[in-house]
Amino acid sequence: MTALENIKKEFITNLLINQNKGVENIQKNLYSYEDYENLLQSAYEVIKNNPDDDITSIRKKMYETSGINEAVNHLIYEMEMAPSLSISYGTKNYQEVINAGKVNQINTSENSIYDLASISKLFTSISILKLASENIIDLSKDITYYDERFHNLKGVTLLSLLTFNTPLITKGRIDEKDISYEESKNRLYNIMVNENFLSTANPYTDLGAMVLKEVISKVTNQNFYDFVKENIIDKANMQKTSIFVNPQDLSYLAPTDNTIVYKNGEFIFRNIPLGTVNDEKAQILGQQANDFAGHAGLFSTSENMAKFAISLMKYDILSEKYLKSMSKNATGRFIEELNSYKQFFGQLCYSKNPNPKATEVYHPLSGTSFAMGGYTGNQFTLDPENNVFAFLGSNRTNNRVANISGFDKSKIKHFPSGKETILIGNKEYINSSTYSSKRDEALRCTLKLSLSYLFLEYYVNTLENEIDLTGTYSRHI
């Protein structure tokens, strides 16, 4: 057995161990030794067949065999699922960005700005966990212990909201048309436990994060965005991450305007001015109040989100104990009557779902990996055990049909390229409602490549070669 083969065996053994860290039995052993061997086969062949190549050349050849170009081309140029896309990915040492499409007639780049939508929840989760790690709050205590304004939530703990374990409901929508800021806030403070919520239903909600945001502000006596900026954004040097986009940067902002949704038997066109967040609750309780709403409302770039990932992996923002607790399954289980799994959530994030078609967290990653998606077309995955990550930014809601719940799907026009359109009036619009499943191939290719780069780093370090493994690379296709 060659040195390379021995190193590959050691590396795969580590991956096998790491996939079972921090997970329940139902989430264990989702990948076998053979699965990992197949996953790394291309990377192994590149290293084996190019012994005299430098690190840059080997990484380039790994990229060329990764399938990323084909997956991104199919998603953006053939299916036209979004006007633009920017994916940052890699290891703690080395990061790449792949860009496709255009933002405001300019080629997408690592500086293109995206509406993070629900990925913003990760900043709320990390904020509450930071306070817990400093013994400022106790996650087992009731919401009302820290904030009596939520008088209907007696008996509801911080942890239960952090883990989507308490269904909530408000008297009237927080984002009702023409609602005032004061009334929207009042409805939030009068939030109640939804006693009629089905135990088999998906427990995902924005409301828990919105309540936790208020608790953090109350406990710290600080505007929530200011807290997040001080404790996360500035620490990670994320200079392009904010609740507002600077006027001079608007040309870099990927628009989400003309978001089309099917509701009550008709298509509704949502006008969203450039610089306004897509989420209406985040508009009212976030931007209009010069604050971060907690569930959505942040803008960022793929380059900034790479900085976010690296800072997390270095434990600059949150301790190892609390970071690796985020992925712990709190909701997932098999439901006999539905013959399927209830969605697996951790702490305002996804945990591994054993069903490979339903999981938001890529199965080859460690058990401490977590992920979160965003309505506007984004996804963030972090593996703090193996130290790899990926952020996918896009604007799939721009001039596209984003939601067709209740629509007659037989009226969708299908093209050989995979593109889908819907006729509204006299004009055909691209259907991007299935974007989250269609983008998975591109996302998983980047995570697979990140693991390949990690294998390369492990190989170099094991041989004790004095090679600089750090660096960045960006490309547009």
PLM region spans:
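Generic anion/oxyanion-binding catalytic loop in active/binding sites
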Residues: 57, 113-114, 150, 201, ...
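Active-site-proximal loop and beta-strand segments within enzyme catalytic domains
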Residues: 30, 50, 103-206, 222
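Residues at or immediately flanking beta-strands
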Residues: 84-86, 142, 242
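Short, contiguous, well-ordered secondary-structure segments
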Residues: 1, 188-201, 212-216, 416-419, ...
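Catalytic loop of the DD-peptidase/beta-lactamase superfamily, centered on the K-T-G motif
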Residues: 4-99, 229, 270-477
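Residue-level preference for non-acidic, small/hydrophobic
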Residues: 72, 87, 121-124, 128, ...
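Mature, folded catalytic cores of secreted/periplasmic enzymes
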Residues: 72-73, 77, 87-101, 132, ...
